[in-house]
């Protein structure tokens, strides 16, 4: 694990390693100090040869990373695993990863109400898992909140294209999901449910749970944090007002819209009733896989450039010309 600010890690090929490809810690979340680290134009493959389901091709902690234009493949677990704030993950190609894991994703982060301001955009993710393992595409696990995910293309994801694990203040739009095995989008309400009844997530959201402890360690009520992330101005941690849309555990104030989904069930996916109550799920376009030839240049031969007639200028769909190594 490299501990360093103001550095660039670029133009490397990393392969046949036991665990991480690149592990980094930089910046300081609580003081909103960015690490100013760039991880770009790296080819990472054949990682996690020993530590099968620990680590990732790129694993980051802290604040202020740009992770862009990398290609990641042939991994047993996650492609990019991040935590912290102010990260931008864009223009990466991730395929043939999570080959020996299920509760995982090509891009993964989780379990935090204090990791706002991260952006995941314009990534190409395809052909994950293996015959016996069914991972997710982009996985915002365990009530992770405040993420922005748009313009990504996800193809042949064995489980859920976009797995939203009960978080709030999520902005999920203009993504394209093709042939997800279970759901194009799964959005549950595990944090709220964990308070209402005994569930697998209850220990994390009860009064002494790690979600609340993490919140207490974060200066989210400070002027600096509320200026950086205005959502915190309205949020409350008052256990006597658990039905408020501003109570942290509720899957509220999220927007899931304008996503283009090709699904044989003609479904956006599995959206919990409390998500529908507290957030906006709207204007998603659902098509049969039979319509793929109408939308893409030559999808049968792997060309997923959008045809001119279907490239909606009002949306920020994936731009494949910017994706991958340069």
What are the roles of these predicted feature ranges?
Residues 59:
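Aromatic-lined ligand-binding clefts that engage carbohydrates, nucleic acids, or primary amines
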Residues 187-326:
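Acidic, glycine- and Ser/Thr-rich low-complexity intrinsically disordered tracts
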